[in-house]
From Swiss-Prot:
Similarity comment: Belongs to the ABC transporter superfamily. Phosphate importer (TC 3.A.1.7) family.
InterPro entries, per the entry: AAA+_ATPase, ABC_transporter-like_ATP-bd, ABC_transporter-like_CS, P-loop_NTPase, PstB-like
Annotated ranges, domain ABC transporter: 11-252
Species name: Salmonella typhimurium (strain LT2 / SGSC1412 / ATCC 700720)
Protein task: Part of the ABC transporter complex PstSACB involved in phosphate import. Responsible for energy coupling to the transport system.
Keyword Cell membrane found: yes
Pfam families: ABC_tran
Entry's EC annotation: 7.3.2.1
Name of the top EC class for this enzyme: translocase
Reaction(s) the record says it catalyses: phosphate(out) + ATP + H2O = ADP + 2 phosphate(in) + H(+)
Signal sequence residues: none
GO biological process: phosphate ion transmembrane transport
Protein name: Phosphate import ATP-binding protein PstB
Length: 257
């Protein structure tokens, strides 16, 4: 099962294959990512879920030995073409990584940095954008009195929310989250999960997670991957309660992986 038709598609993946040199990492992937919903990728380490996520904003483009074949359609436009403007793509498709990665600058400038690359705002408008992004990331009340302190002064959970605020400050259409809670404590993880659920009101969210309970709590749709192949993709509740494939059932019940 590769299509989820409960909402319009934001991203359509068609016959996608990906290679690290000669290693065939993704094999004939076909799936649709629903607009303004949360889609989770699960599977054992090395199954290709992070590789798939990173094709959505061509993170591999700096490495000539890595290549993608097939189509990834963002609102109907194939982003895998050589004519795709990478900077414009990454303005539309933001990304938050596994480990919090604040820039070595103030909290304010962490948010403003990306905005300045794409927009020329007055100071008042930039102040408003910074407040908006931090509010969206549930971080404004904790940082409003120390905006000019270093981003490194924040706790790990706060730093990850800062990275989310930085990602949405340029107003992308899609937000990619690669294991965003793996380095966080349970309380910080809970806050990030609440935030993910809220973000889908404005963004299409795709999350990679090793935590199946997290996928069950946060996502509307879940894809199970194994050895570079998409094994099953369906409504999250259905995948976890009545999986269609034995491989999926074995994985979610802990029989392998």
């Amino acid at each position: 099962m590769s299509m989820v038709e409960t909402a319009p598609s934001k991203i359509q993946v068609r016959d996608l294959n990906f290679y690290y040199g000669k290693f065939h990492a993704l094999k004939n992937i076909n799936l649709d990512i629903a607009k303004n919903q949360v889609t989770a990728f699960i599977g054992p380490s090395g199954c290709g879920k992070s590789t798939l996520l990173r094709t959505f904003n061509k993170m591999y483009s700096l490495y000539p030995e890595q290549r993608a074949e097939g189509e990834i359609l963002l609102d109907g436009d194939n982003i895998l073409t050589n004519t795709q403007d990478i900077a414009l793509l990454r303005a539309k498709v933001g990304m938050v990584f596994q480990k919090p990665t604040p820039f070595p600058m103030s909290i304010y400038d962490n948010i403003a940095f990306g905005v300045r690359l794409f927009e020329k705002l007055s100071r008042a408008d930039m102040d408003e954008r910074v407040q908006w992004a931090l509010t969206k990331a549930a971080l404004w009340n904790e940082t409003k009195d120390k905006l000019h302190q270093s981003g490194y002064s924040l706790s790990g959970g706060q730093q990850q929310r800062l990275c989310i605020a930085r990602g949405i400050a340029i107003r992308p259409e899609v937000l990619l989250l690669d294991e965003p809670c793996s380095a966080l404590d349970p309380i910080s993880t809970g806050r990030i999960e609440e935030l993910i659920t809220e973000l889908k009101q404005d963004y299409t969210v795709v999350i990679v997670t090793h935590n199946m309970q997290q996928a069950a709590r946060c996502s509307d749709h879940t894809a199970f991957m194994y050895l570079g192949e998409l094994i099953e993709f369906s409504n999250t509740d259905d995948l976890f309660t009545k999986p269609a494939k034995k491989q999926t059932e074995d994985y979610i019940t802990g029989r392998y992986g």
